[in-house]
């Protein structure tokens, strides 16, 4: 019983405790909730108060900013209004000034018009008086006014011309004496310092033979060897009774040199047949190319002219195998360079420019038989192509009078060219005319389409033309020969007759392996 009571009491106590705890916790919770609500309300009230304060401050700031802007705008408007008023005032003042000036101009214009009328009236009166006076003078003197003017002008012109001619003659005489004296000194000094050998070139070369039996081997079976050599080189081989010698005849020194070297190699080798001849001619061409380059380099070194394009060096070397009226063109060019340089040093001109232009002045002659135009025009094109200066091109272009010299160096090159050419024994006219005729003959042949190369042989009595087989067939050869003959008759003067031989060759080459 006691146990049950105890349990009941415990249960009741626990229930009371739980209930009491519940109410206590509830009161505490309600108290905390009340505090939280009060705090939240305070925060909200404070936030409302703060936001109203901030809003009022922002509104106040905005009003102040607007007031500031309005004040600034009003100030700017006042300033602009003031400026506009000032500008309007200046415009009004200018208009008033212009109005006054316009009134003055109108007044002056009226005055000028009146004065002009008075002047015109006076001029009319003067003209009437002059006419009356002239009529009186003409009636008294018996001549018209135009005739009197003509007489006065004629007499005055005659007197002035006489005085001018006397003065000019005296000045010219004095200038010529001084110029002749100075030029003789300069030219004499230049010639004295320059001593160049000039060998008169011929059109034949003699090749020595070890024995006369070699002549038969050179001719070959049915003449095939000699024909092959003549066809490949364009040179005539003359084999006569001259002991142990063969004569090479041709107007082109380069071809003669190729033929000479090839023939000497064939003689030394001993094997002479068409295939070997072709091989030796090709080797000779390469050897002559090297020799030409050496000649050009030697000429540039001898004249102290540096920086020349390699192609111009090669063309300079070719001039060693060209002649002008029998004068070796390369040696002539070297001599012109030396003389022009010496004269330039004497008068204070550009020595390097004078030497360079003197050395290159005849460069066009290296290819003038291959290109159209004078050697001066060809030379100018070559120098432009290989980037020579305008001064050098101008100086070389004037040496034959085709262009007016604009520089002292151009005059010096022209003078040096004339000095070198005019030296006694330097040139021979007849050989040059003969060579030019042969060059013209080859030029006519090469002007036709389909012609590969041509050679003037037999002292110009025969022209041998090699044509391209793919361009000209057998039927067209006869027509080409007839046309070429007619053109030679029309354009060339020559003694006797010229044989036109056209060769069309087709080769088929295969190699057995």
From Swiss-Prot:
Top-level EC class as recorded in UniProt: hydrolase
Subcellular location(s) per record: Cell membrane
Enzyme Commission number, as recorded: 3.1.-.-
InterPro entries found in the cross-reference section: HD/PDEase_dom, HD_domain, HDIG_dom, KH_dom, KH_dom_type_1, KH_dom_type_1_sf, Ribonuclease_Y, RNase_Y_N
KH domain sequence ranges: 203-266
Signal peptide: none
Record keywords, A-Z: Cell membrane, Endonuclease, Hydrolase, Membrane, Nuclease, RNA-binding, Transmembrane, Transmembrane helix
Entry keyword Hydrolase: yes
Gene Ontology molecular function, alphabetical: RNA binding; RNA endonuclease activity
Family, similarity comment: Belongs to the RNase Y family.
Protein name: Ribonuclease Y
Organism of derivation: Clostridioides difficile (strain 630)
């Amino acid at each position: 019983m006691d146990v049950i009571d105890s349990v009941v009491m415990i249960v009741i106590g626990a229930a009371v405790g739980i209930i009491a705890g519940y109410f206590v916790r509830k009161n505490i919770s309600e108290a905390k909730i009340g505090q939280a609500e009060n705090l939240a309300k305070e925060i909200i009230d404070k936030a409302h108060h703060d936001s109203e304060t901030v809003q009022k401050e922002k509104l106040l700031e905005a009003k102040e900013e607007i007031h500031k802007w309005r004040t600034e705008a009003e100030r700017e408007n006042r300033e602009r209004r003031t400026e506009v008023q000032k500008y309007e005032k200046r415009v009004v003042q200018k208009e008033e000034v212009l109005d006054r000036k316009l009134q003055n101009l109108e007044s002056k214009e009226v005055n000028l018009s009146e004065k002009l009328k008075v002047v015109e009236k006076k001029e009319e009166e003067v003209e009437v008086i002059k006419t009356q006076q002239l009529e009186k003078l003409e009636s008294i003197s018996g001549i018209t006014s135009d005739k009197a003017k003509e007489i006065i002008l004629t007499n005055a012109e005659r007197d002035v011309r006489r005085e001018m001619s006397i003065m000019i003659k005296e000045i010219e005489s004095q200038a010529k004496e001084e110029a002749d004296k100075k030029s003789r000194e300069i030219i004499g000094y230049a010639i004295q310092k320059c001593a160049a050998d000039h060998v008169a070139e011929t059109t034949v070369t003699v090749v020595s033979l070890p024995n006369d039996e070699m002549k038969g081997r050179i001719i070959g079976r049915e003449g095939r060897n000699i024909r092959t050599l003549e066809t490949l080189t364009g040179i005539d081989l003359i084999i006569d009774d001259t002991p142990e010698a063969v004569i090479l005849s041709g107007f082109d020194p380069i071809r003669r040199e190729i033929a000479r070297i090839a023939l000497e190699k064939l003689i030394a080798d001993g094997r002479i047949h068409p295939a070997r001849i072709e091989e030796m001619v090709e080797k000779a061409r390469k050897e002559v190319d090297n020799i030409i380059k050496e000649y050009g380099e030697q000429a540039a070194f001898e004249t102290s002219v540096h920086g020349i394009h390699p192609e111009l060096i090669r063309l300079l070397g070719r001039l060693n195998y060209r002649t002008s009226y029998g004068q070796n063109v390369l040696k002539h060019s070297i001599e012109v360079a030396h003389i022009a340089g010496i004269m330039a040093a004497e008068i204070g001109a550009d020595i390097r420019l004078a030497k360079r232009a003197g050395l290159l002045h005849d460069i066009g002659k290296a290819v003038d038989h291959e290109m159209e135009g004078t050697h001066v025009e060809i030379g100018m094109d070559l120098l432009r192509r290989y980037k020579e200066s305008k001064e050098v091109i101008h100086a070389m272009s004037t040496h034959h009078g085709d262009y007016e010299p604009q520089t002292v160096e151009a005059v010096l090159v022209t003078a040096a060219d004339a000095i070198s050419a005019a030296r006694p024994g330097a040139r021979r006219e007849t050989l040059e005319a003969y060579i030019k005729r042969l060059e013209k003959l080859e030029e006519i042949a090469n002007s036709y389409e389909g012609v590969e190369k041509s050679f003037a042989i037999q002292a110009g009595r025969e022209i041998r033309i090699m044509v391209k087989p793919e361009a000209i067939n057998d039927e067209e050869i006869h027509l080409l020969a007839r046309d070429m003959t007619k053109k030679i008759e029309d354009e060339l003067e020559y003694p006797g007759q010229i044989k036109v031989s056209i060769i069309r060759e087709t080769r088929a080459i295969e190699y057995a392996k």
